[in-house]
Amino acid sequence: MAFHEYPVTQDYRISRKVLGVGINGKVVECEHRQSGDKFALKVLRDTQKARREVELHVMASGHGHVVSVHDVYKNSYNGVDCLLVVMENMKGGELFNRIQERGQKAFTEREAAGIVNEICSAVAHLHRMSIAHRDLKPENLLYVTTASNAALKLTDFGFAKKTDESEPQGLKTACFTPYYCAPEVLGTEKYDKSCDLWSIGVIMYILLCGYPPFYSQHGQPMSPGMKAKIKSGQYTFPSPEWDCVSEAAKDLIRKLLRTEPTERITIEQTMEHKWISHYRRVPDTPLFTSSNLNDQREQWTDMQDEMEATLASMRVGPENIQIKSLGDSNNKLLAKRRKGGASPKDDPMDDIKEEEKDDEEEKMIS
């Protein structure tokens, strides 16, 4: 994988504006010195896992529904090697936040179908290259701009993995977000690209009603009851939210949420399903989604925090999966996020800023 080895600050001005926090690193805004264009900069410690993330993201880059990678740098700060990934700046925000911000404007089934079509387009692109994303969730689906017709794009390849002959053992490392993970991910079975289809089914379910099909009744990232529901495929289409949803939509959800991976619909079959292939003809029926997401805004934020904690602190054993609570997690990144601000300690971004500051001062002196 090719990358620049000279300082990123030669090409970009680095801002302290945090755009997001991924499982493997922080994302801040940066500005290209020559063009003045704004980009997103992700900082990763240079590890084999980070290189895999960057390599797969670069491979997938260029598709209309995948966040583009523009530059990659390898720099060292205080003796720590880092990869700095310059990406497209997604100014439109996260998928469900966009729906929450609609206010009284109705969100329709036709709009939901259009969104799922965009997500499926990105996943189909990955699967054609034998890449499983393995972390499909609303926070990783971002809009390019705030315009109503802005494109939705997939990002964060921190758990992505090749599924072809280069991975002879299959995907047997359990990387997942509880609310969106497939049953086979919860056990010791191997799993593959079909886990992405399960995640699409969960996202589609939430888009059509405003709440997830599987949840923890005790507010924990993964309760035994929630785990049992996922493994047995227990979910319903309750009234009144689902009374107005088309049978075609419910049919696709049933095919996506099948517990047996070999029986689950593929991404190609999903794209051919009439609810997706004819998404412009889907009924323009108003849904309860927007009001439910707003009514549960506080719970939704807590759920996102739980998912992030789980992603960063999961521990996989041969017989079971143990997930630390956020309070027990020793992950510094999550602790900073929970406290509402980043501590400057051990943050490569601060070293980058100091280096840039020194460069600017040298220019002023000379």
From Swiss-Prot:
Annotated region described as Disordered, given as residue ranges: 324-366
Name the catalytic site residues. D135 (proton acceptor)
Q: Does the keyword Disulfide bond apply?
A: no
Give the first-level EC class, as a single word: transferase
CDD domains with a match to the protein in the record:
STKc_MAPKAPK
The cross-references to InterPro entries, in alphabetical order and at most eight, read: Kinase-like_dom_sf, MAPKAPK_C, Prot_kinase_dom, Protein_kinase_ATP_BS, Ser/Thr_kinase_AS
Indicate the principal place this protein occupies in or around the cell: other
Cite the record's tissue specificity text.
Expressed in pharynx, intestine and body wall muscles. Expressed in the nervous system.
- One MF annotation (Gene Ontology) recorded for this entry: calcium-dependent protein serine/threonine kinase activity
Q: Which is a Gene Ontology cellular component entry for this protein?
A: cytoplasm
Instruction: Report the function annotation for this chain.
Output: Serine/threonine-protein kinase which is involved in maintaining synapse and axon morphology as well as touch neuron axon regeneration after injury by regulating cebp-1 mRNA stability downstream of the dlk-1, mkk-4 and pmk-3 signaling cascade. May play a role in body wall muscle contraction. Plays a role in the formation of muscle connections, also called muscle arm extensions, between the body wall and the motor axons in the dorsal and ventral cord.
User: What's this protein's name?
Assistant: MAP kinase-activated protein kinase mak-2
Source organism (scientific name) = Caenorhabditis elegans
> What does UniProt list as this organism's lineage?
Eukaryota, Metazoa, Ecdysozoa, Nematoda, Chromadorea
Gene from which the chain derives: mak-2
